[in-house]
């Protein structure tokens, strides 16, 4: 299936097309590939369902994806269907980049694979924005170096010995006055007062 994408803007929405193929005794393989287009679009095929046709025999039908890795062929089964047990399977999370080959490994079909073909225009604007961002970052660093650093906060001097003693005397006097005002305690230890602090 061919897709058309207009180049009216750089940030165009992706074009999504319904895609499907049939595998049977005569056509056991199908290759999904896209033609090189002038606009350099990124293509993906998201599989949705694999189902058997109404004329399928009551036998196991196994469909697999065939890939070429380092010159060696590698196959991955994606569904095993049988009309009396499981005539249809829903595919979730299988997104493939073309070219992709589907093969009917076992069974005679007909077996139908459907999905969504998405074509997105490659967006190189992020590279331009990144270059601009780096240039702006360098300018900001230079401006920061030109500015003087703010003056450091001056610490308050520590309390002197005389100030500490005066504060201690004041607290002692408050303790003595609060003891005189408080009512007498009953029970164990009643009548025992607190010894006044020695005066220095």
UniProtKB/Swiss-Prot annotation:
Basic residues bias: start-end ranges: 153-170, 185-200
Annotated positions for site Interaction between pentamers: 58, 82
Positions in coiled-coil regions: none
Keyword Heme: no
Residues annotated with Phosphothreonine modification: 4, 8
Post-translational modification: Activated by phosphorylation of multiple serine/threonine residues, along both core and tail domains. The level of phosphorylation gradually increases during egg maturation, reaching an average of 7-10 phosphates per monomer, so that at the time of fertilization the activity of the protein is maximum. Methylated by prmt5, yielding both monomethylated and symmetrically dimethylated Arg-192.
Keyword Repeat listed: no
Region entry Acidic tract A3, spans: 174-176
Region (Disordered): 123-200
Region of interest called Acidic tract A2, as start-end residue ranges on this chain: 128-148
UniProt family annotation: Belongs to the nucleoplasmin family.
The protein's name: Nucleoplasmin
Annotated source species: Xenopus laevis (African clawed frog)
